[in-house]
Design a protein with these regions (language model features):
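Extracytoplasmic cell-surface/polysaccharide-interacting catalytic and binding patches
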Residues: 1-69, 73-136
Length: 136
């Protein structure tokens, strides 16, 4: 599986996609975006699945929001470099994918938060998720 269009593509350190790869079917996900920066693009199949998950989560009282979705190679490079400078190599390589081996570049990955984190009700996303799961 070396075709970037394939949903089961192996992408990690050592398995890279070209710098110029951009998914053909990027679409705007119809859920809130935390930073209002327009970073809500995903491949259509992933966007559809996320929208379905959003609706299910909303029924449970969780209002999800996108922190970051599709990232082109050059943007992933910026994030990677910032983490290297801020946190050092040992931490950065654990937290951020190398440019060219990020599922964000494939349009299949999304970083989520919630409305309650954005408005300050919860400090971190996991606190709200743990509470929601415990009441199910």
């Amino acid at each position: 599986l070396d075709d970037p269009k394939h949903l089961l593509l192996m992408i990690k350190r050592g398995f890279y996609v070209p710098k110029t790869y951009v998914p053909e079917n990027l679409t705007a996900v119809q859920i809130p975006v935390a930073h209002n920066d327009g970073n809500n693009l995903m491949r259509k199949d992933a966007a559809d699945a996320l929208e379905s998950m959003y609706k299910d989560a909303k029924k449970q009282g969780l209002i999800l929001a996108i922190n970051s979705a599709y990232r082109p190679y050059n943007e992933q490079q910026q994030v990677y470099d910032e983490y290297m400078v801020t946190y050092g190599v040992q931490t950065a390589v654990k937290l951020v994918a190398e440019p060219g081996c990020s599922e964000h570049q494939l349009g299949l990955s999304v970083d989520l938060t919630s409305q309650s984190v954005m408005d300050g009700t919860y400090a971190v996303f996991g606190q709200q998720m743990n509470r929601a799961i415990s009441v199910m």
